[in-house]
From Swiss-Prot:
PROSITE patterns cross-referenced by the UniProt entry: COX3
Classification via Pfam families: COX3
Gene: COIII
Descriptive protein name: Cytochrome c oxidase subunit 3
Effect caused by changing I210V: In strain: Bf-H03 and Bf-H04
GO terms classed as biological process: mitochondrial electron transport, cytochrome c to oxygen
Transmembrane recorded as keyword: yes
Membrane-spanning segments: 11-31, 32-52, 83-103, 125-147, 160-180, 198-218, 240-260
Organism of this sequence: Branchiostoma floridae (Florida lancelet)
Assembly description: Component of the cytochrome c oxidase (complex IV, CIV), a multisubunit enzyme composed of a catalytic core of 3 subunits and several supernumerary subunits. The complex exists as a monomer or a dimer and forms supercomplexes (SCs) in the inner mitochondrial membrane with ubiquinol-cytochrome c oxidoreductase (cytochrome b-c1 complex, complex III, CIII).
Function (record text): Component of the cytochrome c oxidase, the last enzyme in the mitochondrial electron transport chain which drives oxidative phosphorylation. The respiratory chain contains 3 multisubunit complexes succinate dehydrogenase (complex II, CII), ubiquinol-cytochrome c oxidoreductase (cytochrome b-c1 complex, complex III, CIII) and cytochrome c oxidase (complex IV, CIV), that cooperate to transfer electrons derived from NADH and succinate to molecular oxygen, creating an electrochemical gradient over the inner membrane that drives transmembrane transport and the ATP synthase.
Keyword hit for Transmembrane: yes
One MF term in the entry's GO annotations: cytochrome-c oxidase activity
Length: 262
């Protein structure tokens, strides 16, 4: 067999990962219910481990098909790009719901909140302290990931590795600052609708930063092991798009919730 096929598409081989991933998601869901109602975390941890293992194995297969088997033709890459764009659009609407909840409560505070915003008794964080530093850190990481992209397209391998490493470190630094800010916050998620919307919106953004940092760490490892070329590096492009999306969401969070909302 020559491996010839009369079309440019990649027809994937039968894979166990969709079935395993669905089972893992079900296990995690049941585990969350067990944690909420019975304070038992064993099933939830099992579900998390199964999901992480499935993600690693599945993406390992995708990397092998793209890098070592050459299955990702220009047509396949076009589909992947459109899929990533649609995924980011879905994430935009995900965060739109949190902003809607925040403005629904803040633009017309109810009597229960003291007809004021922030609610009576809630002392918001200083927008010009740690949040401003976090803004500078995340915007700087956006610059360094763009630097890495240009270095990669120009074939400057060492420069791409260095700038990617700086981006990852800035992402981890942001996460550390966010965790410290949560620890020092004078209110909790249970303190009125302000605490709920604040921690849910910024918490999910923090989760996206962790996911994006992990994505970029994988890209850094792949760059070290010569997986990318100047013309074939969609994995990194997707990570860069995702990271810029995280940057933009943070700017809206900072302006709306930290600055205007306080």
């Amino acid at each position: 067999m020559t491996g010839y096929q009369p079309h440019p598409w990649h027809l994937v081989e039968p894979s166990p990962w969709p079935l395993v991933g669905g089972s893992a998601a079900f296990t995690l869901t049941v585990g969350l219910v067990m944690w909420f109602h019975y304070n038992s975390i064993s099933l939830m941890i099992l579900g998390l481990v199964m999901i992480v293992a499935t993600m690693i194995q599945w993406w390992r297969d995708v990397i092998r098909e793209a890098t070592f088997q050459g299955c990702h033709t220009s047509y396949v890459l076009s589909g992947l790009r459109r899929g990533m764009v649609l995924f980011i659009v879905s994430e935009v609407f995900f965060f739109l719901a949190f902003f809607w909840a925040f403005f629904h409560s803040s633009l017309a505070p109810t009597v229960e909140l003291g007809v004021t915003w922030p609610p009576v008794g809630v002392h918001p964080l200083n927008a010009f302290a740690v949040p401003l530093l976090n803004t500078a850190v995340l915007l700087s990481s956006g610059v360094t990931v763009t630097w890495a992209h240009h270095a990669l397209m120009e074939g400057k391998r060492t420069e791409a590795i260095q700038s990617l490493a700086i981006t990852v470190m800035l992402g981890l630094y942001f996460t550390g600052l966010q965790a410290w800010e949560y620890y020092e916050a004078p209110f909790t998620i249970a303190d009125s609708v302000y605490g709920s919307t604040f921690f849910v919106a910024t918490g999910f953004h923090g989760l996206h930063v962790i996911i994006g940092s992990t994505f970029l760490m994988v890209c850094l490892g792949r760059q070290v092991f010569y997986h990318y070329t100047s013309s074939h590096h969609f994995g990194f492009e997707a990570a860069a798009w995702y990271w810029h999306f995280v940057d933009v969401v943070w700017l809206f969070l900072y302006v709306c919730i930290y600055w205007w909302g306080s």
